[in-house]
Amino acid sequence: MSQLDVLIVDDEESIRNLIAANLKDEGFNPKVAANSTQALKILSEKPVSAVILDIWLQGSEIDGLGILEIIKKRYPLMPVIIISGHGTIETAVNAIKMGAYDYIEKPFNNDKLVILLKRACEVTKLKRENIDLKSKVIDKTELVGGCSVTLKYKMEIEKAASSSSRIMIHGKVGSGKELAARLIHKQSKRVNNPFIIFSPTCMTTEKINQELFGESEKQENNTKRPTILEFANNGTLYIDEVSNIPIPIQVKLLKFLKDQTITKPCGKNIKVDIKIITGTSKNIQDEVNNGKFLEDLYYRLNVSSLKVPSLYERKEDIPLLVKYFVKQLSKFSGLKERNFADETIAALQSYEWPGNIRQLRNVVEWTLIMNPLTTGNNEIIKPYMIPSEILANSANLTKLEDSFDMLSMPLREAREVFERQYLSAQMSRFNNNISKTSSFVGMERSALHRKLKLLSLHIPPTNRINEEEYEEANA
């Protein structure tokens, strides 16, 4: 089985070490924590596959149930098995209601814990696969949006599709690298042939080797079935997060790229014809410099490069994206279609979206689920209905000076404070595009320029739309 990270949280060192030793023997990679501070620090650095959590933690700021609550908020799919030597039926019921996978009393049988842990990980894996499948059904191959950044991006995809060269897609997590790969395949001459996705993340070296080349350290696992490279023959293979491939497999992949020939464990050579597209959210050049990625392999995969714009760069597409996600969620998940109020869209446009398109889709889905229709009418989604963290972090738009503070100011000063914050928020919303901001706020471009200068609001050079606007705004 793949080596899965498991966090063990228990204030008794002997129990932590005993569970860790047993799990290591079973092929898991255990991590240990004695209190809430250590546990949450480990999770923030890298989420684990499962957590074994004691309820009563002496010397801990937060008890087990408190940690469970935090885990379920931050990592909803992460399975948590509660252990306790002082538990009651009521405690067990509360833990399950809060989202724990199961509850087991100390002292417990090690075999029982391992079976429970394996089952929890398998159930979670199936849930993730189901979510991924639903996401693929919904997103498929449609790039929604019409802003200048998106139109330019669509043209770059068309050019990439017309080329037979290998392509490396660079983009932040959730920005849509897989969608770009699908679009390239869809617009290429290989459209009627297979499009295969391979994600090495969370796979062991042996598993990757077996999937790509059909080889395994265990002779009985040397499969006769076609490998992923064979399945992709005459089509397109998309390797997601390619930097996660271990060096030994990188060497084999490099050898394969030279002549696109697979040598099966039986000794048979198979020639294939595959367009290879790779995706990465990391700076591969840095990985090369740090000895984590083969330089020769990087150059062979990065023949053509495509950068996926972040949602922050495509804020003007948010109204269209929201409508698209609402329709798709209504169609595939049975959620009722709703309209988002203009002020709600404005709040969404003012958020920075570190999770990009994927995060926006999740926010739209969460909003529809948590705000069911109370009447038969299409109730408008108001700002207070979207997640509070979106409102709290929206750039300035929801942070206008408190009205009580303004009451203590003279009219001229209060008006200046409001205008500065209002225009700063609108400029951020429209990505510092003077033309679109002036159109929305109802001012002439020249008047807006003067007002920005008067309020000492400067357009950052890195975000300006063009040189003319920048020079005019900051003259």
Swiss-Prot record:
Residues 5-121 form the Response regulatory domain. Keywords: ATP-binding, Nucleotide-binding, Phosphoprotein, Transcription, Transcription regulation, Two-component regulatory system. This is Putative response regulator NtrX-like. One of its GO terms (biological process) is phosphorelay signal transduction system. ATP binds at residues 171-178, 232-241. PROSITE patterns: RESPONSE_REGULATORY, SIGMA54_INTERACT_3, SIGMA54_INTERACT_4. Residues 143-369 form the Sigma-54 factor interaction domain. It holds the Pfam family HTH_8. It comes from Rickettsia felis (strain ATCC VR-1525 / URRWXCal2). Signal peptide: none annotated. The modification 4-aspartylphosphate is found at residue 54. SMART domains: REC. InterPro entries: CheY-like_superfamily, Homeodomain-like_sf, HTH_Fis, P-loop_NTPase, Sig_transdc_resp-reg_receiver, Sigma_54_int, Sigma_54_int_dom_CS. GO terms for molecular function: ATP binding; sequence-specific DNA binding.
